[in-house]
Amino acid sequence: MKINVVDHPLIKHKLTLMRKKDTGPKEFRELLKEITLLIAYEATRHIETFETEIETPLEKTKGHFINDKDVVIIPILRAGLGMSDGILQLLPNASVGHIGIYRDPKTLEAVEYYAKFPKITDNSIVFVLDPMLATGVSSIKALEIVKKNGAKNIILVTLIASPEGTEKVNIEHPDVIIYTASLDKKLNSKGYILPGLGDAGDRLFRTK
């Protein structure tokens, strides 16, 4: 199973604040951005560097740069938008695409309503952002769409994952690496993660 739980005191602290039901939208947004940045620090280990010569104030030396122009960031709308700024702080030259997917409340199936991507090549490293990996249907659908547009190296970055959703993604997309802040207990009968943090999109945009 290609899942990496980023175990760090700062992430645990900030995630606990996000889980609290009385955390307001302003703080929730800030915490989501901060945790995404911390997870992305680990997830970006897969980016290759190239050697170059630079000049310090004292002498010439060799250094390393990453080619973040080969990086594509794709948040799943709506809630994935709240993660974009966090990873873009680390990779400011990355290209950004968007996928619009919602989960039908009756069937729990993923429905695509929007997709717009920058150029994706064989060398691209694509980060798909989805705060909650619950049933897995939205992430599976998004990964399917991204692959159809040429993505070969894909990393799914999520805040909280369920065992059920993680297993489904691994079955459908065994080549995709998952990074998360927490692997939670289970799903409830409505497809929400327990203990989770509720509906990330609603808390992010104050739509309920």
Swiss-Prot record:
Which SUPFAM superfamilies did the record assign? Answer: PRTase-like (SSF53271)
Positions with a binding annotation for uracil = I193, G198, D199, A200
User: Some GO term, biological process aspect, for this entry: which one?
Assistant: UMP salvage
Give a single Pfam family match.
Answer: UPRTase
Q: How many and how are cofactors bound here?
A: Binds 1 Mg(2+) ion per subunit. The magnesium is bound as Mg-PRPP.
- List residues binding 5-phospho-alpha-D-ribose 1-diphosphate: R78, R103, D130, P131, M132, L133, A134, T135, G136, V137, S138, D199
- Give the GO molecular function terms: GTP binding; magnesium ion binding; uracil phosphoribosyltransferase activity
What the entry lists under PANTHER family is as follows: ADENINE PHOSPHORIBOSYLTRANSFERASE, URACIL PHOSPHORIBOSYLTRANSFERASE, CHLOROPLASTIC
UniProt cross-references to HAMAP family, sorted A to Z: Upp_B
Family to which this protein belongs: Belongs to the UPRTase family.
Q: What is this protein called?
A: Uracil phosphoribosyltransferase
